[in-house]
Amino acid sequence: MVAAAKILGAGLATIGLAGAGVGVGLVFAALINSTSRNPSLRPQLFSYTILGFALTEAIGLFALMMAFLLLYAA
């Protein structure tokens, strides 16, 4: 019963990875949209995009870490 709860909890924790994937897609979609509107701001927008990508991906990595902790922690 405990093993089933661990597997279920890990599966639910990986839902955060889907959110991270959507978030990264939205970040880069906003970069493409903004660059097409004002190409001269591309260097500044790209640095903001990389920051947004890193923060969004960190949430996904935290979700993955929680899934591994639920599966393999004692």
UniProtKB/Swiss-Prot annotation:
Keywords: CF(0), Hydrogen ion transport, Ion transport, Lipid-binding, Membrane, Mitochondrion, Transmembrane, Transmembrane helix, Transport
GO BP, sorted A to Z: proton motive force-driven ATP synthesis
GO molecular function: lipid binding; proton transmembrane transporter activity
GO cellular component: mitochondrial membrane; proton-transporting ATP synthase complex; proton-transporting two-sector ATPase complex, proton-transporting domain
Compartment(s): Mitochondrion membrane
Site note Reversibly protonated during proton transport, residues: 57
Cross-referenced PROSITE patterns: ATPASE_C
UniProt keyword annotation of Plastid present: no
CDD domains: ATP-synt_Fo_c_ATP5G3 (cd18182)
Residues annotated as transmembrane: 12-32, 50-70
Keyword Membrane assigned: yes
Pfam families in UniProt: ATP-synt_C
Superkingdom of the organism of origin: Eukaryota
Membrane topology: Multi-pass membrane protein
Broad class of where this protein is predominantly found: mitochondrion
Family in the record: Belongs to the ATPase C chain family.
Stated role: Mitochondrial membrane ATP synthase (F(1)F(0) ATP synthase or Complex V) produces ATP from ADP in the presence of a proton gradient across the membrane which is generated by electron transport complexes of the respiratory chain. F-type ATPases consist of two structural domains, F(1) - containing the extramembraneous catalytic core and F(0) - containing the membrane proton channel, linked together by a central stalk and a peripheral stalk. During catalysis, ATP synthesis in the catalytic domain of F(1) is coupled via a rotary mechanism of the central stalk subunits to proton translocation.
PANTHER family the UniProt entry points to: ATP SYNTHASE LIPID-BINDING PROTEIN, MITOCHONDRIAL (PTHR10031), ATPASE PROTEIN 9 (PTHR10031:SF0)
Oligomer status and interactors: F-type ATPases have 2 components, CF(1) - the catalytic core - and CF(0) - the membrane proton channel. CF(1) has five subunits: alpha(3), beta(3), gamma(1), delta(1), epsilon(1). CF(0) has three main subunits: a, b and c.
Protein name: ATP synthase subunit 9, mitochondrial
Gene it is expressed from: atp9
